[in-house]
Amino acid sequence: MNEPHLLIDAGNSRIKWALADAQRTLVETGAFGHTRDGGADPDWSTLPRPRGAWISNVAGADVAARLDTLLDARWPGLPRTTIRSRHTQCGVTNGYTTPDQLGSDRWAGLIGAHAAFPGEHLLIATFGTATTLEALRADGRFTGGLIAPGWALMMRALGTHTAQLPTLTTDIASGLLAGAQAEPFQVDTPRSLSAGCLYAQAGLIERAWRDLADAWQAPVRLVLAGGAADDVARALTLPHTRHDALILSGLALIAAEAAAATAAQA
């Protein structure tokens, strides 16, 4: 069968989707909001009927219901699978003590990263509502991770829980720092808040990378993904690689493995 797979990554802030062909190449991509208030529905009108939909959803039941409504409106009865983290899948072994507690987005991202950088030790930093770090050995063993507030959440927390600090978005903060990246210390409150929270992100990444390289006594590639990756990258002093399709690529691998298993049983 050559029908494509529809891949859906429902994150905490928005929903990304892609159509993957038989070679797992992402041939169509897009994004939309959790609700119609967050933007237009995806335009799937010109897409061929996929073999099925493979979904990572960390956004909850309301988003799951919205996805079902959208899928049924375009392709009634389309098979769909919402993935869960496993102990082992697509060459990656889950080091969590309770494997299914690992977020499905992080699991798919690990699978995508292992395939994208074969034979390399990796530290994967993803910048969304939360900043997550995953330590992935070259043999596919996920040995653990870290979760911290994302850049936007840090700034929003300070603005919300203090009387005199502003509440800044990442767009505002990025603009404020555009001409001040060379200066480690800022001379007004909005820029000080923006830079302080950004440096907190960069400091976390650099400390984690150094600790991991020391523990493993081997080179570790730092991989950055997510909406704030460009801003955090400018504050880093480490070499790094950008990859923005790890989750969708991982979903493509999961879908392909399942299709191969089904074909083998036929």
Swiss-Prot record:
Positions binding substrate in this chain are Y96, G103, S104, D105, R106, T189
List the SUPFAM superfamilies: Actin-like ATPase domain
Gene Ontology biological process terms, A to Z: coenzyme A biosynthetic process
Instruction: Spell out the family assignment given in the record's similarity comment.
Output: Belongs to the type III pantothenate kinase family.
Concerning NCBIfam families, the annotation shows:
baf, PRK13328.1-4
Self-association and partners: Homodimer.
Which protein is depicted? Type III pantothenate kinase
